[in-house]
Structure formats: C-alpha cells, structure tokens
Amino acid sequence: MAKLTVKDVDLKGKKVLVRVDFNVPLKDGVITNDNRITAALPTIKYIIEQGGRAILFSHLGRVKEEADKEGKSLAPVAADLAAKLGQDVVFPGVTRGSKLEEAINALEDGQVLLVENTRFEDVDGKKESKNDEELGKYWASLGDGIFVNDAFGTAHRAHASNVGISANVEKAVAGFLLENEIAYIQEAVETPERPFVAILGGSKVSDKIGVIENLLEKADKVLIGGGMTYTFYKAQGIEIGNSLVEEDKLDVAKDLLEKSNGKLILPVDSKEANAFAGYTEVRDTEGEAVSKGFLGLDIGPKSIAEFDQALTGAKTVVWNGPMGVFENPDFQAGTIGVMDAIVKQPGVKSIIGGGDSAAAAINLGRADKFSWISTGGGASMELLEGKVLPGLAALTEK
C-alpha cells in the first residue's frame, strides 16, 4: 500500500486521533455483535503500547434530529472496550467543548479516550456526514498532528471524522485493519492468484451492476445466486413465477449476459415455495423455471453441485451476498453449500465482502474457515467495483 501506516510514525507521548468503526448493533443498550470492536483492538493496543494517547472517534447508527440520539450513545461501547483492553476508557460523553478538551489534555501516555457518537454532530446541519470544514479542523486540533484511520466500514464516505481530520493534520495514516482490508480485497481483485472466482448473491441486480461489470473483466468466472437470479432469468424469457424481479433492470441483466463471454454462471435450479412467509409447500424446481404461484428463495441442489464444480481448483475467491434467504433453515442449503465448496479448495485465498455474507458465515459457523471477512459492506463493494475510497485517498503518501 502506497500510504503511510501506523508503524511509520512516532507515537510516544502524542495525542493520536483514531477513526474506528464501532457502529455495532445494540439491543436495549446491550451490544449484540462486538466484531467491529474486536477488529479495532490491534491498532488501539499498538498505539498505547508505543506510549501514544489514543483519542477514538466513531459513529453509531443514523442521527438526523435530537430524538434520534436516544439509544445511540457510545457509552456501552466504552464499557465493552474497557473490558477488552483491561483498562479504563475515558468517556466524556460529548463531541466538542471544554469538557472534551480538558479530558484529552489530562490523558497520560497509554491511556484511551472515546469521543461521543460523531453523528450527534449531524443534528445541527449534518456537520459530520457533509464533512463540515470547521468540524474537521476542530477535531484535528485536539491531537498532535497524527491521525490514524482504521475504519474501513466508512472509508467509502467523505465525513468530517475521516476525510475532514485527514486534511488538517501533518500525517494521516492507515491502521492495521484498514491496511489488511485493502490488502486482501484490492489484491484479490487487481493481482489475484488464478483461477479467480467471484460469487455474487443478494436480492438486487441494481446494487451489484458496477461490481459485476468490474469482476467480469478481472475474474475467470462470476457465479450469480440469490434473489437477483430471477431478474437474469426473466431477461432471458424464463418463467419466474412470483419471484423477486427488478423490471427496470431486465435490459441491464440481458446486456451483462451478452457481454460476459460465458463467464457469468447462473443457477440451474431453485428451491421454491408457495409464499415468502407462511408457506405450506417447499420443493426443488426441475430446471431453471419457477412454478406459477411459487417463488424462488434459494439455489437448488443441482446448482450447488454445479457451483461446487465451478469452484474446483480456485486459488482466489471473493464472495459477496448469500445464495438464498439463509436466515430461514429451509432456504440456507445454497449458502452453506457454496461456503463449504469455497473453503475446501486447497490453498485458496477466500474473502467475504462484508454485510449479509459475513453474517451468514458467522451464523452458520464457518467464519473461521475463511482467509478474510471484511468489516465493511459498502466499502468492500466499492473496492470490488474498482472505485477509489475517499477515506483511503485522504491518507498521506509514503
């Protein structure tokens, strides 16, 4: 990576500003999935072990008006982080002002402070989300000229807490998580060990057009599953029953199929049901066509076998999007089958591009078998599209 990293700067005695991604799910004030906090630990620990004073910034959820602040404080995160680090985490509970400044100035080497939810600044004119110049300058002024961006999950956004701070410090560098995310995903797409197979699922073609186009150029095969299968089917005149379809994307699907040179591989059968919820019948289709009055909710057994074959010998695999409604045991066989086909390949570099695929791997007990699971759904999608991420572009060149 041609950007400076946290290892390239002297941190001792410095107030180091760090953008982390602590946007974790909370239920009744309790964190239900702490993966993002765990993922940030190596960078935080490195900073404090080097004698730096870590000042952490993160958003949590969406905050547009005062009422939205309810249940969005980072207080539970501060407590969880303190337990994981085995030391106190200072939490002033504000995003600016004398209370924050005094707490920062009182920090000693090796201490950690967490600023309140950066999106609380969005209540008064979207200052965080619109990268307000004054806010970026103010937050930058709280440190000693070093900013570490370790929030891959927001790297595709230009906000005050990443791009804004970066523009106003002497050195803006990548943390370990950001460095690893870029290394795994970008290298997989730009310089893959071949054969390189991409697997794309999820419900909408519209979400993945740019990704499919980019990967058709880069990958040896692109396997398609999930709800978007049926838009590709209908574009070819195949009966899809009541399956999900994007009528306004039929031409796009047809165009992608025509220019794919056979690289785009669609399922050959489906698991169909007579309703999405409250169904009374579930069965495998004979071939591609879905029965009238039914809808496809997973790829079928023949497709699982065909995808298994397509993955044989693969050395690089990037997977983004489940093959079916994996949350329901009746429609998770496709997602499980594809995961198992990926991880059994000898010496494969296997990467999950965040979002629902990451949830599927974790929920179905296969997370530890993958080389890398991205922490950022939207950011990894934009990397797979070949886009430049603003949060990364803003960092200091080596």
Curated annotation (Swiss-Prot):
It catalyses: (2R)-3-phosphoglycerate + ATP = (2R)-3-phospho-glyceroyl phosphate + ADP. Substrate binds at residues 21-23, 36, 59-62, 119, 157. GO terms for biological process: gluconeogenesis; glycolytic process. GO terms for molecular function: ADP binding; ATP binding; phosphoglycerate kinase activity. The keyword Cytoplasm applies. GO terms for cellular component: cytosol. ATP binds at residues 208, 296, 327, 354-357. Monomer. This is Phosphoglycerate kinase. The gene is pgk.
